[in-house]
């Protein structure tokens, strides 16, 4: 194998195995920043040895063994340094008592081969609430997504130094706060899991409907969020909201190819060619939703949103959509996760089920809500309802206001076209 081919093989293996390697190192050293350094050192070792010695029969095992050794060496060094600082005034038996437990714990951690638990710990640590939302997203994509700083920066249209600083600060914050590398206890788990799901869905949403830039969608972000969601569902198969989120993302991703035309312009849901929807993703989404439902209990916001997406997925054409059922699901969603955005979406469903006049009354009641003051979908929805009611001049004004508020160029073009056509 040529050196170039070997490097390509290393890159491919690394992209798949990096999260597991970082997770295993973090299990031993209890610091995700140090763990990533050790993982990078292991990658450098592979780049040095494999072109000379050949690619191992089991590349992933080679990397895992190498990072374990480096992690244990780091723990030994730190334990010895700590012992030397404390040895003044102590006998050697006291010194040994100080050193041995740390090494024993590290050896026990390194010998535990349950990589699934390690990944789950890394997910919870990367999404810890002590971090800002932006920091959680960046750190998760770096450690668990295997994305480079440059790739994250390009995905979110953010300068690379800004992303790099976010990641560095996130690692420092986790270390300073002494955040344990562990799966949270039962009483803390719901809130911590909600933080994880929020991060994954934020990544997906930015791919599904980009908030800024020249592209309407960024499929690579959707793919990454889906991958993380599927990994999490495999590690936590009895969590209905995890399954609900996976179902929601699968169903929404199934429409990705139909959401833009050949020129990359947005195509709204009711105008989409449903033959372009991905049937495999629809089946996967419906199956995940069924598993979430079978777990019982009160349906959470992600499971309810997945049920909403399923209503669209089951409709062979737009006119087959059960809008009354969608209104009922939004009623349920408003109970468990009340927000003005949910109310706005419910108003859209009411308009489809019962007519634009009923919906406009609901939308007008939201116009003074400060949470929606800069939300471009409010004037967009209002413009659509006014157009259906024949109030063209008012509709044009609303679409123009929505165009002023959006930061996505493709969406702005769509809204201005709607203003012209109203």
Segments and roles (model prediction):
Residues 1-23, 33-36, 190-198:
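A short, charge-rich alpha-helical start-of-domain segment used by transcription regulators
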Residues 13-32, 45-49, 124-128, 209-212, ...:
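Amphipathic, Lys/Arg- and hydrophobic-enriched alpha-helical face
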Residues 229, 236, 296, 330, ...:
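Alpha-helical junction/boundary sensor with strong preference for TPR arrays
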Residues 78, 86-134, 142-151, 158-331:
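Amphipathic helix-loop-helix modules that constitute alpha-helical solenoid scaffolds
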Residues 43-47, 57-86, 171:
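Σ70-family region 2.3-2.4 aromatic/basic alpha-helix that recognizes the −10 promoter
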Residues 245, 249-252, 305, 309, ...:
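"A position-specific structural signal for the A-helix of alpha-solenoid helical repeats
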């Amino acid at each position: 194998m040529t050196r170039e081919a070997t490097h390509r093989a290393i890159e491919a293996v690394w992209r798949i195995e990096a999260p597991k390697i970082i997770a295993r190192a973090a299990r031993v050293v209890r610091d995700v920043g140090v763990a990533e350094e050790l993982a990078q050192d292991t990658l450098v070792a592979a780049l040095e040895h494999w072109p000379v010695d050949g690619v191992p029969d089991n590349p992933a095992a080679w990397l895992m063994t190498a990072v374990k050794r480096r992690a244990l060496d780091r723990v030994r060094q730190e334990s010895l340094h700590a012992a030397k600082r404390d040895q003044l005034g102590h006998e050697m038996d006291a010194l040994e008592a100080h050193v041995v437990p740390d090494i024993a714990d590290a050896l026990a951690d390194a010998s535990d081969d349950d990589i699934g638990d390690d990944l789950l710990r890394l997910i919870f640590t990367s999404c810890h609430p002590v971090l800002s939302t932006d920091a959680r997203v960046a750190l998760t994509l770096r450690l668990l997504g295997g994305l480079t700083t440059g790739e994250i920066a390009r995905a979110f249209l953010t300068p690379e130094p800004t992303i790099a600083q976010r990641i560095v600060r996130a690692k420092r914050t986790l270390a300073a706060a002494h955040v344990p590398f562990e799966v949270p206890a039962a009483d803390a788990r719901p809130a911590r899991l909600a933080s994880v799901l929020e991060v994954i869905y934020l990544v997906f949403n930015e791919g599904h409907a980009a908030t800024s830039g020249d592209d309407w969608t960024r499929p690579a972000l959707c793919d990454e969020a889906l991958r993380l969601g599927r990994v999490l569902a495999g590690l936590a198969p009895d969590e209905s909201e995890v399954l609900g989120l996976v179902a929601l993302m699968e169903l929404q991703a199934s429409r990705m190819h139909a959401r833009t035309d050949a020129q990359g312009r947005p195509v709204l849901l009711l105008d989409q060619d449903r033959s372009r929807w991905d049937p495999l993703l629809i089946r996967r989404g419906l199956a995940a939703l069924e598993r979430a439902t079978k777990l019982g209990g009160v349906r959470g916001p992600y499971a309810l949103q997945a049920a909403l997406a399923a209503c669209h997925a089951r409709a062979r054409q737009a006119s087959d959509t059960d809008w009354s059922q969608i209104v009922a699901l939004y009623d349920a969603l408003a109970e468990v996760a009340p927000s003005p955005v949910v109310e706005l979406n419910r108003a859209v469903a009411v308009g489809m089920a019962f007519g634009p006049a009923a919906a406009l009354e609901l939308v007008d009641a939201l116009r003074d809500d400060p949470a929606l003051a800069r939300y471009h979908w409010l004037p967009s929805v209002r413009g659509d309802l006014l157009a259906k009611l024949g109030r063209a001049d008012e509709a044009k004004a609303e679409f123009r206001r929505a165009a002023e508020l959006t930061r996505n160029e493709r969406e702005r073009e769509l809204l201005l076209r709607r203003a012209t056509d109203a």
